[in-house]
Curated annotation (Swiss-Prot):
The keyword GTP-binding applies. ATP binds at G30, L31, S32, G33, A34, G35, R36, G37. It comes from Mycolicibacterium paratuberculosis (strain ATCC BAA-968 / K-10) (Mycobacterium paratuberculosis). GTP binds at D81, V82, R83, S84. Displays ATPase and GTPase activities. Transmembrane segments: none annotated. This is Nucleotide-binding protein MAP_1147. Coiled coil: none annotated. HAMAP family: RapZ_like.
Amino acid sequence: MTGPGELAGSRPVDAHLENGAGIDVVLVTGLSGAGRGTAAKVLEDLGWYVADNLPPQLITRMVDLGMDAGSRITQLAVVMDVRSRGFTGDLDSVRTELATRNIAPRVVFMEASDDMLVRRYEQNRRSHPLQGDQTLAEGIAAERRMLAPVRATADLIIDTSTLSVRALRETIERAFGGGANATISVTVESFGFKYGLPMDADMVMDVRFLPNPHWVDELRPRTGQDPAVRDYVLGQPGAAEFLDAYHRLLSLVVDGYRREGKRYMTVAIGCTGGKHRSVAIAEALMQRLQAQHGEAQLSVRVLHRDLGRE
């Protein structure tokens, strides 16, 4: 049994492959219950395009789509169902086909000890895919034998027996990018409280403490994107101080998200109708975040959920 994240082949996995095709391909395989799904989620958080349980014969077609002009797919991770008959031969065929495209895919094999796999299946009250009328232990043993040739040719073997989810994330980040320098995607979303709270918000801030431009006749029909409304909102007492303080708070939260391996954050800014104050503040906050953090560290976008709803 290997240690967590042991390199199985001679090819380094912690460096981006200089594939002539311009697309990096990772094939995630391994024992059922060893964490393939978790590994796929981490890769997705790192910006990889993830295809789950894609049949081997469709992998090259997916790669061809990624190589098409205009495609934004530069990193493709495929989670493969390795239990199908003839899988080892299929995997070899995929590697051969990709080699003709000047692509050398990396194979990640997820495994765990028999005791740990038994414990996980018992905790989830699920049967093993190969168990049939056998015992759970026999099903695990059968799959381990079936996948031995795949394991022997893997580029990276990750034993999750003693790994927490966080430790598994760190292992994958070290191999495939991310970690302390990973990009975090932040959505700054304006909304109106009268339409309800955003369900996907990680943080919610109420800016109804600022005077409402709705009560200024010449500003009422305009929105927070209008320079006159923006200047009115940002020029109010406390507005600049609020932006300074909330920006500092968000910077602390972003640093914490990065340490915890989280890659997505939604910050919701609310006012009464989501038309004036929240829009202006959300735009200003987005600009501050973009100015402080480079695009390589923080990807920021603004979303005005209720703009135009009146």
